[in-house]
Amino acid sequence: MSRVFLGAVLAASLAALPCVAGAQSKMVIKASDVHPPGYPNIVAMENMGKKLEKETNGRITMQMYHSMQLGGEKEMIEQAQVGALQIARVSVGALGPIVDDLNVFNMPFIFRDENHMRKVIDGPIGAELLEKVTASPARLVGLGWMDAGTRNVYTSKPITKPADLKGLKMRTMGNPLFVETMNAMGGNGVPLGYNELYSALQTKVVDGAENNPPSMLTANHYQVVKVYSLTGHLIIPEMFVFSKASWDKLSKEDQALIRKHSREVQMEQRVLWDKYVSEAETKLKAAGVQFVPADKEAFFKATQPIRDKYGAKYAALQKRVLDTK
């Protein structure tokens, strides 16, 4: 661990300790996300901090750590578990080992579209999964959900059906489920670190990748490949959690206040996200990226074996998700 990184962690830990001021304790909520300033997650969380500060007359404030200043998702979870960090925005994949049912969201086409996903996380299923995180021994409190968009494939040629991916090496996230999903879609899934992808595209180590439009833009992948095909195979929500070690030190009133504003974050972030995606698509098109419709039904059928294999243990939950209207 570098001295710079260790220093940031220690600073976060010390600053998060409550200090007594009269009869009430002051608290600096340390919040962390891997994304850069201006990203919808960051903006929504910063707005929450402003509301908390205003409603508590400055007794509760928030400090936002962005751009992996406190490490990646694994490190953020570990820091939250010991109270060195209060709020961490993490992926479902990172929380899957804590609450196994969360893995149902990693399956291809589990959601029809983003509106379907939002209805699920806003409803009983979303609430139950937040509570399962809270009830787990992981010492985390599930606060709310965030939208991470729809993942589609991008390469140097249009991909409208599974046969179009034949022979193409496509970068995927590391989970074997995602590799097998890409293989079922017709390509050759290649697990690769996100930070390695730009050079891998340049050198043809991989022929393409899959992600949302903002990621294609901000990572500059559009400079190498110019066709974005709307397969819509993955729509994976994300969660933000609170350190239970810190949560238990809060009054019931402060807990209720944070929960109230967490719900607002969940609603606000998606509005910011939709605008962010629209702006990213406009910029990509201006840079010469071609957006191509794809036969989603063909890809859905091609990935049915993946849902059968990985979804068997979540059959009841999977049915509830699919039945949500």
PLM-predicted stretches and their roles:
Residues 7, 24-116, 125, 131-325:
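N-terminal secretory/targeting leader peptides
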Residues 1-4:
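Positively charged n-region of N-terminal signal peptides that target proteins for export
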Residues 7-17:
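Bacterial N-terminal signal peptides
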Residues 17-23:
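Sec/Tat signal peptide C-region and signal peptidase I cleavage site
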